[in-house]
Amino acid sequence: MRLSLCALAGALVLSTLTACDPPGQPKAEELPAAQVTDFKVLYTENCSGCHGDNGQKGPGRILNDAVYLAVIPRETLKNVLIYGRAGTAMPAWAISEGGPLTPQQIDALVNGIEAWKKPVTTPPGAALPSYAETTPGDPVNGKRLFVRGCYACHGQGALIGPVTDPSYLSLVSNQNIRTSIIVGRLDLGMPNYRVLNAGHPLNDQDISDLVAYMVSLRPAEAAMENANTK
């Protein structure tokens, strides 16, 4: 009888233990905000509103794009998160710059975004363009390239919108224009640099020329302010 009571007591203890949630790490959403390093949580709460739920189809720069991630240096991507983009809607995110994120959280975002990288193949005889301008552009050749490859969608009166409009050019930096030409918006139907030269890829100089042409149309009062914004 005594053995039976002991066995019953043991069974009750065991059933009580198995009915409870096992101890373990708290979920990311249960951690204090400064301790969250889960990429999905950080991205959803801080980035998806502008850059889309999966790095695409947001109003801001597409991040989940093979060409973009192939050309932007890791250090540049990290600095954009830390310091933001002057003159744009991209704020500084690092605590050191007045933002909410710790260095560990910045690194978690950089690592998560870079995990979206995919192999990029370049057309025969072509190389990936440089993220930043390496040589000055020629606006005369840039205008020729614009008329041939961009005007149908982005000229005056075009349905998609004129990117040569002075108001638009007052708001964007030279680097913003360059990145948009290189990367495009495949998620929204805008091609990237590979087909903007009458169906052929633009080379690095072509891209600089296009930027130079568009910058030449920028209002004088905005030219100095935006020219050196990275």
Where are these regions (language model features)?
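Gly/Gly-Pro-rich "capping" loops immediately C-terminal to redox-active cysteine motifs
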Residues: 29, 36, 40, 52-82, ...
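Bacterial N-terminal signal peptides that target proteins for export
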Residues: 1-8
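C-terminal motif of bacterial Sec signal peptides marking the signal peptidase cleavage site
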Residues: 16-19
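Flexible coil segments in periplasmic/lumen-exposed cytochrome c-class electron-transfer proteins
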Residues: 23-29, 33, 37, 44, ...
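Hydrophobic helical h-region of N-terminal Sec-dependent signal peptides
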Residues: 8-14
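Disulfide-stabilized extracellular ectodomain repeats and their linkers
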Residues: 44-47, 60, 87, 147, ...
